[in-house]
A protein has these predicted regions:
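Compact nucleic-acid interaction/catalytic patches
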Residues: 24-28, 33-61
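C-terminal terminal-subdomain/extension
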Residues: 60-106
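Short, charged beta-turn/beta-strand-edge "cap" motif at the junction between a beta-strand
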Residues: 19-23
């Protein structure tokens, strides 16, 4: 369990307990932190499904398996739902994510 009150930062990959909209089941899933405010953490889904569109994040970068960051699937959780931090992505990858996210807003 992560320590409550910790500051979460953009670019951290975490394991979080998530309840998706199509199920009552809570599952542990990797996610990318976009920002944290007032103990609420806004995240982007990370999936290992290679057929999904998004930004790739590889084993070489720290994932257990090659995965996809889905900027079209964003959710907010309480910091209490975060199990642990896995790693932080590179500054270069953060810039790619920011650029892609801003492109989606146009």
């Amino acid at each position: 369990m992560m320590k409550y009150g910790r500051k979460y930062n953009f670019g951290e990959v975490i394991i979080a307990r998530v309840q998706f909209t199509d199920s009552f089941e809570v599952k542990k899933r990797p996610a990318l932190i976009l920002f944290e405010e007032y103990k609420n953490v806004v995240c982007a889904v990370i999936t290992s499904n290679p057929k999904m569109k998004g930004i790739s994040i590889t084993k070489k970068e720290g994932m257990a398996v090659n995965s996809i960051i889905k900027l079209n699937y964003i959710f907010t959780i309480s910091e209490k739902m975060i199990e642990k931090k896995l790693f932080s992505i590179s500054k270069e990858k953060c810039e790619v994510i920011k650029k892609e996210f801003l492109n989606k807003l146009d």
